[in-house]
Amino acid sequence: MALTCTDMSDAVAGSDAEGLTADAIVVGAGLAGLVAACELADRGLRVLILDQENRANVGGQAFWSFGGLFLVNSPEQRRLGIRDSHELALQDWLGTAAFDRPEDYWPEQWAHAYVDFAAGEKRSWLRARGLKIFPLVGWAERGGYDAQGHGNSVPRFHITWGTGPALVDIFVRQLRDRPTVRFAHRHQVDKLIVEGNAVTGVRGTVLEPSDEPRGAPSSRKSVGKFEFRASAVIVASGGIGGNHELVRKNWPRRMGRIPKQLLSGVPAHVDGRMIGIAQKAGAAVINPDRMWHYTEGITNYDPIWPRHGIRIIPGPSSLWLDAAGKRLPVPLFPGFDTLGTLEYITKSGHDYTWFVLNAKIIEKEFALSGQEQNPDLTGRRLGQLLRSRAHAGPPGPVQAFIDRGVDFVHANSLRELVAAMNELPDVVPLDYETVAAAVTARDREVVNKYSKDGQITAIRAARRYRGDRFGRVVAPHRLTDPKAGPLIAVKLHILTRKTLGGIETDLDARVLKADGTPLAGLYAAGEVAGFGGGGVHGYRALEGTFLGGCIFSGRAAGRGAAEDIR
């Protein structure tokens, strides 16, 4: 996606940049930064957007995303028979977040405000700007605990028609041909300028030009220095998911041992640099030990960035086994509790788990996260989408991983499957009898219409929802049924993704100091601010909330900065 708005070249020498003036500087050209820039430009202010990557990377992580949005009591939900409400969504959010620290004051305020937004103007505000929504609503993070615990009580995951690129383009279009908006790509901020207890600008390094494709690592060779001044600086630079050193440094003790093997769900430039830079300028950083990493990562056979992993978005039917071949405990079923599963895995002493399933399940229940893995949705090709769903066999991108992925094995018998699993590199040899016992016990539970097995009960409950029955969840059946074969196993890795803590802000996205007062002139939005306040999600997320958090906090930052400048 190329910008056609007024755009600086990728490398502008410091002397050439000195004459540029702006009312506000936005650090980061991802979704939160673009939304903030739109709000500033709409109010007639001059905006300079700085980013360390080239113009191919405008939109940041949002461009790569599935485009999922958390909406409450939407027309899409109601058409599918889902009865949602603000009260139910807030109950789910607070039960999931489990705020329990003194520093959670502002994150909890943001949580209330965000649920208000999701249940109120979020859909209409985005629709007015061009958002189109796929009609089926997904059910992510189903929980499985009590009514006040973690999880979505109802489906709320709304997919942008066109996925991440279409969502990014909504705000890119607003910035096109605006003479008051300038981009400075390959400009890496190294320092926030603080004068008289206020942030008044930025200093940094001009990096050599890069023509690397989106997401690929780029050079950090310096070709100059820069300094820009403005009345407001908005930090919207993303989290730490591409920086495994920082992920490990901030790994929470409650989550067990630090994984030795990690895949990256985000490009290397998601490095978290600006969190430390803002902290040095006086910003309070809270909840750095809260993070969101997926447990269903698979190695990308065609990587774009280092250790590139793709997340499986699973339906609920696969049998989930740990590295020793033992079934994960209730309610750690596919798609129910990401962080609970992560904690179990890290405390097991291993960094991987297994899905055991069959062709019938993978055909309907495997989706891959990311716009590039969903060409029908991303390309807004309805005919292709309908054909792929009606066609026998898995969607094309899933089939490609079955054929080429290093983490997939298949066989006609369970004994042959376990033997193939044991042939994969870096695995603890599985005992066939242990795996067979788990599979056999599970298969006995599908003979009747009732069951004591929590996963089978959850599958049947899911199929009462039309969206799941039609397009997401297969009818319970024996994994070893020859008609559903062949059997398939997938080795699953831990995949880095989101930073849930970050720079502390008030509801106007003003950055706060350790004493709780605003650091004048500085604002933060998106993942660098924990998607709002320094951690709007608390310990866990409900999904569809990360893009929405960037939009909501970016909007707040743009409006807050504009108000203060005026």
Swiss-Prot record:
* MF terms in GO: steroid dehydrogenase activity, acting on the CH-CH group of donors
Against InterPro entries, the record matches this protein to: FAD-dep_OxRdtase_2_FAD-bd (IPR003953), FAD/NAD-bd_sf (IPR036188), KsdD_DH (IPR014614), Succ_DH/fumarate_Rdtase_cat_sf (IPR027477)
Q: Which Gene3D superfamilies match?
A: FAD/NAD(P)-binding domain (3.50.50.60), Succinate dehydrogenase/fumarate reductase flavoprotein, catalytic domain (3.90.700.10)
| Pathway connected to this protein | Lipid metabolism; steroid biosynthesis
**Superkingdom of the organism of origin:** Bacteria
* One Pfam entry name: FAD_binding_2
Q: Which cofactor does it need?
A: FAD
- Binding sites annotated in the UniProt record for FAD: 23-54
Known EC number: 1.3.99.-
Q: Which family does it belong to?
A: Belongs to the FAD-dependent oxidoreductase 2 family.
This chain's source organism reads Mycobacterium tuberculosis (strain CDC 1551 / Oshkosh)
Q: Name one GO biological process term.
A: steroid biosynthetic process
Q: What is this protein called?
A: KsdD-like steroid dehydrogenase MT0809
Keyword line: FAD, Flavoprotein, Lipid degradation, Lipid metabolism, Oxidoreductase, Steroid metabolism
